[in-house]
Amino acid sequence: MLKSNDCLFSLENLFFEKPDEVENHPDNEKSLDWFLPPAPLISEIPDTQELEEELESHKLLGQEKRPKMLTSNLKITNEDTNYISLTQKFQFAFPSDKYEQDDLNLEGVGNNDLSHIAGKLTYASQKYKNHIGTEIAPEKSVPDDTKLVNFAEDKGESTSVFRKRLFKISDNIHGSAYSNDNELDSHIGSVKIVQTEMNKGKSRNYSNSKQKFQYSANVFTANNAFSASEIGEGMFKAPSFSVAFQPHDIQEVTENGLGSLKAVTEIPAKFRSIFKEFPYFNYIQSKAFDDLLYTDRNFVICAPTGSGKTVVFELAITRLLMEVPLPWLNIKIVYMAPIKALCSQRFDDWKEKFGPIGLNCKELTGDTVMDDLFEIQHAHIIMTTPEKWDSMTRKWRDNSLVQLVRLFLIDEVHIVKDENRGPTLEVVVSRMKTVQSVSQTLKNTSTAIPMRFVAVSATIPNAEDIAEWLSDGERPAVCLKMDESHRPVKLQKVVLGFPCSSNQTEFKFDLTLNYKIASVIQMYSDQKPTLVFCATRKGVQQAASVLVKDAKFIMTVEQKQRLQKYAYSVRDSKLRDILKDGAAYHHAGMELSDRKVVEGAFTVGDLPVLFTTSTLAMGVNLPAHLVVIKSTMHYAGGLFEEYSETDILQMIGRAGRPQFDTTATAVIMTRLSTRDKYIQMLACRDTVESSLHRHLIEHLNAEIVLHTITDVNIAVEWIRSTLLYIRALKNPSHYGFASGLNKDGIEAKLQELCLKNLNDLSSLDLIKMDEGVNFKPTEAGRLMAWYYITFETVKKFYTISGKETLSDLVTLIAGCKEFLDIQLRINEKKTLNTLNKDPNRITIRFPMEGRIKTREMKVNCLIQAQLGCIPIQDFALTQDTAKIFRHGSRITRWLSDFVAAQEKKFAVLLNSLILAKCFRCKLWENSLHVSKQLEKIGITLSNAIVNAGLTSFKKIEETDARELELILNRHPPFGTQIKETVMYLPKYELKVEQITRYSDTTAEILVTVILRNFEQLQTKRTASDSHYVTLIIGDADNQVVYLHKITDSVLLKAGSWAKKIAVKRALKSEDLSINLISSEFVGLDIQQKLTVFYLEPKRFGNQITMQRKSETQISHSKHSDISTIAGPNKGTTASKKPGNRECNHLCKSKHTCGHDCCKIGVAQKSEIKESTISSYLSDLRNRNAVSSVPPVKRLKIQMNKSQSVDLKEFGFTPKPSLPSISRSEYLNISELPIMEQWDQPEIYGKVRQEPSEYQDKEVLNVNFELGNEVWDDFDDENLEVTSFSTDTEKTKISGFGNTLSSSTRGSKLPLQESKSKFQREMSNSFVSSHEMSDISLSNSAMPKFSASSMTKLPQQAGNAVIVHFQERKPQNLSPEIEKQCFTFSEKNPNSSNYKKVDFFIRNSECKKEVDFSMYHPDDEADEMKSLLGIFDGIF
């Protein structure tokens, strides 16, 4: 490496080093103190006069020595002492505003002053004639003899020798090659940014025998340079020629000047350990020292990245600790940074610094559960983000913690102009100002320490506005502005503009930049580590691959071996190949182990180039000598957009390694059209503006919930405390106001803006507004503020109907605004489609139609995959899933509270409670992987437990501990620990009974929740102290009957909890669904059904409403969805026929039972009272007369030979002509399937209206026969196929008969005792199977139910029909008849075919009803005897 002292360098050298310079300080001081790291001794620093004399003696370029020293400010002097050092054409200093007009151009400067520049331009103009911008002709103003000459390449001689620097600095810090003028053409524009162009083919390799290497990685590109065709002319725009650096004052570095730096010894002894890393504070820290340590004024400092701003915060903390006596109990310090990574860094740093002196630190970021509030109670320093602190402070009136904050530290306060995050920061600071003012009014201001704001910002032009915003009424904030000169590592900033045609996509433009990376690295890296930021993860891999092909790195053998070792330790095969060649990539979608390997290799300097996404800039601190931002567009929210200024500054801030470098370079590669924008940005000329006016609605609601705002006037007053107000007064046009408005006009506009947002809130009932324009929060608005939910999400859930299933809710949640930052990437679609639908794998529970095409479908798929324990191999998808569940758990908790507060329907409330628990446990509510919730059990061990058949907590507890260890392949006492964990889970029992006080419209039930193991839980509990269960009861009308949360602490006191609940009668059914839902555990829930008994049917005037199939059924089968099965409501109101009386059926609900007589009544009884048995026989004959459907199967009843029966009487006879209205119109057989006919109550009404007509014509619709000869005219095959086509569906339902019999026995009918024997006998006969092979279905069939609903809801529509049929069936049938009746039943023991029993059902619905009150034990024997002759009477 060339020696740093009086070395020779040539203009032909490719690489250069920027001089160490100090820019003007903004203060109006004539001279400021400065020193360079490492600081020289005072005796070594020459006097200012000597420096000026030295400058005078080196005017001419041909002299042997020339110092790299800056001259006095052009504004002060116009002498001939103004020089531009050779390498200053690459200076990227940014002037303060007061020097903006002092740009030098050729007309205003003497020839000798700029001779070397003129020579440079002359030489360049001979090579490049065509540049965009102004063409320069320097030959006219500069004599030929001042033109520069080239140095000999092989000789160390030169016609122009310069002294490289004023102070000698060791070789290991500075060593570089210098730029070759033949290859490098650099124009210096008035914008203070250098645009650079290299000529293809002219550069030479810069490794020669005299060069020593600090880093052993040299870049050799294939082409070694840019060509004009590769880069395009637009890269080098030189609109005008002017000096590219800010002229500086020659700093007076004197003994007194150095003495103005503050020493750490000024800090009290017990706090000096905080600043133990250095003996003196740097210039910026020293300037801020007095204001921070000796006053309590609010403080704003603007300084470049890396200038030691963190120490400013530490000084402010030290001031507070000095003021507050020990112990520091009642103080909180809040550090707020825009990203979690900065909070983590600060947490790790300050935990070590402040821990020894007794301060506790706590990181509060992300969706932290509110349990962390208890930990924060004991923390002194809290690191948080604006979003998290916003959600915390929305409850500050309820929480005294926030009022204890005495110091509020804001890092990167310039992000307040960020479109998305800025409004949150602005609102939080304004709210903290409100907290301060309220606490001061509540306390004695003379004794209380006021809250202090200390804010740190990157260099911004309007820092005074930030200071004004942070000022309180009495004391304005101190504002300290520092420029780039105080950065410990001087940063050179380059913006390269590349042509991009209008038809060229962003993807294609990004690809073209990949081929220019090698030349940029070669030019600017100085053979030191380089960091390249790319827009996408795929772009990172592509760029690294292109560089490895285009360039070869010269590395030592040891370095190659170390890279080989790194390569073998990574999992990613692509990364392994690239890493061997000296490059690597890093992004958040990689395996954690791979990322750590790459970070380690880059940190120690073994890795020359690292490609990464912008996430690295926000997270891991990996500084580099050169930072390249390849393309300023990135993919966010489904479209390409420019990086925010925060992102750009954060990425640029990675340039410079204080422990290695004194200079660093940042290069931005962008399109020509946006080049000027980034020049302005890097010059820090972008004014900070507020974005609060675009996001006002959520924050207004939050302030109303806090009662900060109660009317419009206070709303405007609140806005006055924001940055929005300050900037609107100064720049109204930016906020859509007329530029000529005065203060009153702007305030009126702001008030109008407030009212618009307030009306939107009021429209969704989030706030209540009265005529006086006063506001009050509603419960919905309070929940929206507490759970930090966006207005758009609340708007979406206001449209729910109340019948949403789990699937519907998941779909709604997936479309929430909170998931806008989730992106659907091309390479993820295959994995997602496999999760959605794949016949060969386990897929998600509710598959979506079609392929995965949108962000919402991706979110939906990942939610279901996580809940279904389906492993996701893609690490990027795993990360997205974690982010989704952070937001999703908050949204689902809000949803369950919101639905409860809105008094929505039972089904959606139950499902929202279950879904909130699912998100918390990351399991479906019916999952077999209950063991995954236990400590030390992950998805792998959980799969092993499920494969062993242990799918519930009960089974796990009953399993031997050693067997568990065998299943899990773990050593003792692992199995014992698992068993203990399960043992100490709460075990609930739910008892529900109806209180025997019956009424027509209401019933009382007693619900008891029992904690079975409450004695065991007194000593130890697996569940958290905050665990609770929710008791929710709903009726058949989808209404919530009762909702209550029961905490474990309540149950632990007595072991049980009981509540008497009044239940109003539902229209559709008397069934109640009682559910006990655990808040944190899957596998503890209990679901029960209860059928409530009421005295009288529900009547409305003279009509009884009959509603059938539209009942809401909530079923909880093991693998069935918690859903609302809602069929079409085909119920009609049947009027009672004039002259009819009410039947004697004791149906629980006459409008839902299966009897027509319950709806339309029965004919009045004749005067001559018939006996019970004769009435029954008459009823049976009438039924036989009315029945109109031919039998499905032939009845072959074996008669005794002794019985004289005329077969012709029962033979087949053609039917007489039917009435004008055809039978198909009555029964709708041709149009409707048999399954739907049960829901046509008007059919029965019409049949009943003309019974005499059928009787008179003596049409026998059911015929019995003994032989085959009379059936010859029938098409048996068609009949049987027709009947069984419908039967097949029903026979799949198993066990229904038993359910019916048990439900009948379990119901609380008054006459239950007298009928018990009768029902038991019937249960053993007909109820066990409803398929009667001898009896044909007349005109109806049962509704179709799911298996789960049939199991769980015994009293469905039509069940009552079967019950009455059972009660009416004669018991003592002859053996022959029984044998024939149950022939088909034996074939299908589990089937439930209602078609076959409808012959008897039709009887029960027609002429006469059986009054069960007439059945007494005394009459039973006589009736049974008479019953033996029933068939004799018929046949």
Swiss-Prot record:
Its cofactor is Zn(2+). InterPro entries: DEAD/DEAH_box_helicase_dom, Helicase_ATP-bd, Helicase_C-like, Meiotic_Crossover_Helicase, P-loop_NTPase, Sec63-dom, WH-like_DNA-bd_sf, WH_DNA-bd_sf. Residues 1296-1306 have a biased composition (Polar residues). Residues 1109-1139, 1295-1315 are annotated as: Disordered. Residues 777-1092 form the SEC63 domain. Belongs to the helicase family. SKI2 subfamily. It comes from the Eukaryota. A motif (DEAH box) lies at residues 411-414. SMART domains: DEXDc (SM00487), HELICc (SM00490), Sec63 (SM00973). One of its GO terms (cellular component) is nucleus. GO terms for biological process: resolution of meiotic recombination intermediates. Its EC number is 5.6.2.4. This is Probable ATP-dependent DNA helicase HFM1. Pfam families: DEAD, Helicase_C, Sec63, SNRNP200_wHTH. SUPFAM superfamilies: P-loop containing nucleoside triphosphate hydrolases, Sec63 N-terminal domain-like, Winged helix' DNA-binding domain. A zinc finger (C4-type) spans 1143-1158. GO terms for molecular function: ATP binding; ATP hydrolysis activity; DNA helicase activity; nucleic acid binding. ATP binds at A303, P304, T305, G306, S307, G308, K309, T310. It comes from Homo sapiens. Keywords: ATP-binding, Disease variant, Helicase, Hydrolase, Isomerase, Meiosis, Metal-binding, Nucleotide-binding, Premature ovarian failure, Zinc, Zinc-finger.
